[in-house]
């Protein structure tokens, strides 16, 4: 089966645009491989698209070492799908963005991972070795559970860097 017949839904929450920027860059990368990508904010979720997608990527900012309440609401709203095992066997991944270099982003990825596991999804981590510490380096935060990004206190047009 070709990649062009596969679909990916990226569901994210972004209060100030920084996490939306990360979601958009992930979508652009996936589209380059020929995968059909659906990008949606948690406040405008198309449940049918999520149900039909081959893979789901969830993302949100790190707030106080936890997921955003908007993503938590989506998780709770998925209860009927959990009971029906609708997403069982789908690939899943997660990402988070925050102002601090750590800010307990790992806890956010663990929460997203646990949500995916509850649904019987197959988790895909980040396979990239850390390459350095500059804002342009791949996996500069040495995360393997999922993508961690950091934004300075500036507009989403400036930070995080692509």
Which role fits each region the language model picked out?
Residues 91-141:
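Short, glycine-/small-residue-rich phosphate/pyrophosphate-handling segment
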Residues 56, 76-79, 83, 100, ...:
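Alpha-helix boundary/capping detector
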Residues 18, 60, 66, 99, ...:
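Gly/Ser/Thr-rich helix-start
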Residues 1-87, 136, 153-161:
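N-terminal beta1-alpha1-beta2 submodule of the flavodoxin-like/Rossmannoid cofactor-binding fold
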Residues 141-150:
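Mobile gating loops/cap/lid regions near enzyme active sites that modulate substrate access
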Residues 95-97, 151-155:
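Short, local alpha-helical segments
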Residues 75, 89, 126-127, 148:
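Short, intrinsically disordered/low-complexity patches at protein termini
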């Amino acid at each position: 089966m070709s990649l062009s017949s596969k679909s990916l839904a990226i569901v994210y929450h972004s209060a100030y645009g920084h996490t939306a920027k990360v979601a958009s860059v992930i979508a652009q990368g996936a589209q380059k491989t020929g995968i059909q990508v659906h990008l949606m904010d948690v406040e405008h979720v198309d449940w049918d698209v999520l149900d039909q997608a081959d893979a789901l990527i969830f993302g949100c900012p790190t707030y106080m070492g936890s997921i955003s309440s908007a993503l938590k609401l989506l998780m709770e709203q998925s209860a009927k799908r959990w009971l029906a095992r609708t997403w069982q066997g789908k690939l899943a991944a997660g990402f988070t963005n925050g102002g601090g270099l750590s800010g307990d982003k790992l806890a956010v990825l663990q929460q997203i991972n646990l949500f995916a596991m509850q649904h019987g999804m197959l988790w895909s981590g980040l396979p990239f070795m850390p390459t350095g510490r500059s804002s342009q380096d791949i996996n500069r935060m040495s995360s393997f559970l999922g993508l961690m990004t950091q934004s300075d206190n500036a507009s989403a047009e400036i930070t995080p860097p692509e």
